[in-house]
Amino acid sequence: MNSYLRKLVEGQHLTEEEMYEAGLLLLSDNILESEVAAFLVLLKAKGETAEEIYGLVRALREKALPFSNHIKGAMDNCGTGGDGAQTFNISTTSAFVLAGAGVKVAKHGNRAVSSKTGSADLLEELGVNISCTPGEIDYLLENVGIAFLFAPAMHPALRRIMKIRKELNVPTIFNLIGPLTNPVNLETQFVGIYKRDMLLPVAEVLQKLGRKQALVVNGSGFLDEASLQGENHVVVLKDNEIVEMSIDPEKYGFSRVKNEEIRGGNSKENAKITLGVLSGEKSVYRDTVLLNAGLALFANGRAETIEEGITLATHSIDSGKALAKLNLLIAASHEKLERVN
């Protein structure tokens, strides 16, 4: 590890293979917590490259719990966090809208790290059992159409690093790579990131991971979601080509809303917001979810255009299908599920 730390101190980039090897060291018991903290801080200060991100993702996926089945059409819409905006759980709420529109959603997430309420905190508050095995997750994806993958359970080697991340209390490469380490073999992905200069590198990593289609967004105000506040910067991966574009919410019929107006709170407060959106209540929360779910449906290929994606998302909510998916997941996640090993 010392050789890698020296390179980072000197501002040098690591190769993909060096980062892969460093990642395996980070996940081992043969490294001091001080070395882990130093590595994460130095890497953040230098700035992460696509090769470094992919190298670490390779190490994490290698050490993750194995999934035996390929779930056709599986998608994730996990964001990085780390934007400091304290918004409600936009991507988790949107996940049920996607499922209601017929997408199989493998929602990868965690408890709060730099926010008040993480996806795991919200889902527990709503009554979802987040402690599912890979076999149970496969079952839920096939039979319910949505499942939650609790990151610490999927990545047991990360437990010590999670403690160090919490103590550091600053965004690190692990915020960036969280959405990229989903152990399910995803076909498509919608990723929100808090660092605009990482749009292309993250898209390049998704390409290396073999995603058929993907969309990476950095929202107005550097939100790790699409925002109604103003212009959103987007990179689209389709047909193995990467294209940059911008998304103005007003073009799709939404009024501009400041990010401060979609702040969330604790898990109880955020659960109330999510239930309100899924129940069809008109609000700025609903409009934010419609924009994000619409973009995700476009990224998935379920919709040919963003406009069509927003229309499908609206129908998912107003037909009651999105809320039905939540209720079905709550019930099914507590049943004794068939385990596919």
UniProtKB/Swiss-Prot annotation:
Gene Ontology terms describing biological process: L-tryptophan biosynthetic process
Cofactor, how bound (note): Binds 2 magnesium ions per monomer.
An example Gene Ontology molecular-function term: anthranilate phosphoribosyltransferase activity
Pathway named in the protein's UniProt entry: Amino-acid biosynthesis; L-tryptophan biosynthesis; L-tryptophan from chorismate: step 2/5
SUPFAM superfamilies (alphabetical): Nucleoside phosphorylase/phosphoribosyltransferase catalytic domain (SSF52418), Nucleoside phosphorylase/phosphoribosyltransferase N-terminal domain (SSF47648)
Residues annotated to bind 5-phospho-alpha-D-ribose 1-diphosphate: 79, 82-83, 87, 89-92, 107-115, 119
Binding site residues for Mg(2+) 1: S91, E225
Catalytic activity: N-(5-phospho-beta-D-ribosyl)anthranilate + diphosphate = 5-phospho-alpha-D-ribose 1-diphosphate + anthranilate
EC number: 2.4.2.18
Cofactor(s) named in the record: Mg(2+)
Assembly: Homodimer.
Family named by the database record: Belongs to the anthranilate phosphoribosyltransferase family.
The protein's name in its UniProt record: Anthranilate phosphoribosyltransferase
Organism annotation: Bacillus mycoides (strain KBAB4)
